Amino acid sequence: MGMRTVLTGLAGMLLGSMMPVQADMPRPTGLAADIRWTAYGVPHIRAKDERGLGYGIGYAYARDNACLLAEEIVTARGERARYFGSEGKSSAELDNLPSDIFYAWLNQPEALQAFWQAQTPAVRQLLEGYAAGFNRFLREADGKTTSCLGQPWLRAIATDDLLRLTRRLLVEGGVGQFADALVAAAPPGAEKVALSGEQAFQVAEQRRQRFRLERGSNAIAVGSERSADGKGMLLANPHFPWNGAMRFYQMHLTIPGRLDVMGASLPGLPVVNIGFSRHLAWTHTVDTSSHFTLYRLALDPKDPRRYLVDGRSLPLEEKSVAIEVRGADGKLSRVEHKVYQSIYGPLVVWPGKLDWNRSEAYALRDANLENTRVLQQWYSINQASDVADLRRRVEALQGIPWVNTLAADEQGNALYMNQSVVPYLKPELIPACAIPQLVAEGLPALQGQDSRCAWSRDPAAAQAGITPAAQLPVLLRRDFVQNSNDSAWLTNPASPLQGFSPLVSQEKPIGPRARYALSRLQGKQPLEAKTLEEMVTANHVFSADQVLPDLLRLCRDNQGEKSLARACAALAQWDRGANLDSGSGFVYFQRFMQRFAELDGAWKEPFDAQRPLDTPQGIALDRPQVATQVRQALADAAAEVEKSGIPDGARWGDLQVSTRGQERIAIPGGDGHFGVYNAIQSVRKGDHLEVVGGTSYIQLVTFPEEGPKARGLLAFSQSSDPRSPHYRDQTELFSRQQWQTLPFSDRQIDADPQLQRLSIRE
């Protein structure tokens, strides 16, 4: 596969491409920001211009998360193995070696330079200020809130590092899900990378399938016809990782007379990603659109390193990348690796599915690799005045990478937009170009040997090869719009969105979270803010409504079956919730549903496109074969739970926790697969389930006369550093489901009893 190792010696240990904290870096001047921190460490940053605003953002973020950002920059630079060795994983669960190779390829100098050149002056100034503010904090850091101080990877940062993080974010919906596959791509007969075993690719595929759940969301925008006060109302409930490069951070940004926006941002971004302003609130949910396509290459029979397009033989480009790996003796060795690229994009290999053999190979084209507008897009959204203005800004720039946008404004408008960067293929070409076998497995794959299957170009699109805004779903309503990571189809059942390219949106069964939301939103009764809040805090397991009555019937029919006794008793006592005091029946139910989902024909009422809100429903116990399979599924689930040692009287809050230091904080919520609106992802760790993702930043915004009223919290707290006073404070609030007022006006901010002020200049 073209990987080779070269010893670089002890000198390499001392040389780094990131400068140390104390390095004599050129420092910008004329920087100024005022920061006010309110309760729970939320910074309210005011500056006269973008450079000063970025300066304040970088400083405030470093105070809470310097170690997190520094490590994520190490990842985005492809330097994990240099500092941590080849063993270990990134926050995205990628092994260090393939992670480094992938990001060294993704963030090559020419790509960063092109990205920087495409930025507006305002965005450049935000980035320059951010880097300067972060570096200032590092120069002053005393270790009180920076536990990694003194580590060689905690370094001063440059604007290029922030671009690396941005590009990493961009490809989350595309080639980033294929990092292992890109690293493993090698011609037939070439040496294979040792880390590319079949098991590794099963894990990689599972990671890709989990993308929409772990980076999912719920969103509801209510308009004047349904809100109790006749104005707009928005619930933002994004489900994101609780650590790493996708960990949200609360902040409030102000440039007097030009900008006043509050919400949450991802690490390294000098903009608010989800938030609200004086007259507008917006949020995002991961969409179902395709943001990449695979291309099956017909290889030249004479040479598997060449491929055919319209009968012409073209050579694969070999792109060499190099990384450094720290050995057990502390010495660095240089590893070189070849990435193979076609006119469509890099080659990828998944054994048994996307193979590179003598006749064919697969390439991947990611639409967001050419999306240089993403930062400009969010900064533009931050300045939008109402729903109509936001829509114009999004449709003009087309810089949203892989999410839907939902918004509500003071005038009572509710908006849904499936406006993201999506490949464009003219409808008449899709039947001939698509590869049905892979499409059926959820992989948008096209024929690469026919140039007509290359992405179509429309002059109305903001980027060559993407779908123009006019051909993407938009719905403006005065009652409501909602989304929980389903397609655009049933955003509001009264106005189905249909007839779009299969790359954009398809009419497929909606998930249980959306069914739960729509069950609460149907009707004409006025909706109060409390109603939306309770949809989250109720922690109701919607799938139990569809399945549990029949499951308990099966229990009654098999009362003498010892293997089912404990499970049936727990299920009978369960409250159909994922609350802290919910019983162990929820554990049995989850394990059962994982097996039930694999059964064919087990639903009493299968999905019916004419009744999408009511189906599927029930278990077909009247069919003997189904009854037998379901009984076995429950018995297997019971055996798994009982083997884990969970006591009969265990509560959900005893099992699902977030560990902070030596203490465990009980966390409500559960797997969104089962219709828990407060979706929480947790993994087994010893005798408990440790939360790794799910509900993150919450905002519920209304628009009374005196200004926006927002309630919410940041579930995992502002700081990722154990030494910070804001490492666990909001997590405890989340455990108790105590949403807080988010202070927006100067009056609210200055009245906060925990107010702290700081002015920084240089």
From Swiss-Prot:
Signal sequence extent: 1-23
Alphabetized SUPFAM superfamilies for the sequence: N-terminal nucleophile aminohydrolases (Ntn hydrolases)
Induction: Up-regulated under iron starvation conditions.
GO cellular component terms given for this protein: cytoplasm; periplasmic space
Enzyme class: hydrolase
Chief place where the protein resides: periplasm
UniProt key word Cytoplasm: no
Subcellular location: Periplasm
GO annotation terms (biological process): antibiotic biosynthetic process; bacterial-type flagellum-dependent swarming motility; pyoverdine biosynthetic process; quorum sensing; response to antibiotic; single-species biofilm formation
Keyword Hydrolase tagged: yes
Propeptide residues according to the Swiss-Prot or TrEMBL record: 194-216
Disulfide partners: none
CDD domains: Ntn_CA (cd01936)
Residues at the active site: S217
Catalytic activity, EC: 3.5.1.97
Keywords: Hydrolase, Periplasm, Quorum sensing, Signal, Zymogen
A GO molecular function held by the record: short-chain fatty acyl-CoA dehydrogenase activity
Oligomer and partners: Heterodimer of an alpha subunit and a beta subunit processed from the same precursor.
Comment field (misc): A variable cleavage site between the alpha-subunit and the spacer peptide was observed: Ala-194 may be a part of the alpha-subunit or the spacer peptide. This step of the maturation process may not be very specific.
Function: Catalyzes the deacylation of acyl-homoserine lactone (AHL or acyl-HSL), releasing homoserine lactone (HSL) and the corresponding fatty acid. Possesses a specificity for the degradation of long-chain acyl-HSLs (side chains of 11 to 14 carbons in length). Degrades 3-oxo-C12-HSL, one of the two main AHL signal molecules of P.aeruginosa, and thereby functions as a quorum quencher, inhibiting the las quorum-sensing system. Therefore, may enable P.aeruginosa to modulate its own quorum-sensing-dependent pathogenic potential. Also appears to be required for pyoverdin biosynthesis.
Protein family per UniProt: Belongs to the peptidase S45 family.
Designated name of the protein: Acyl-homoserine lactone acylase PvdQ
Gene: pvdQ
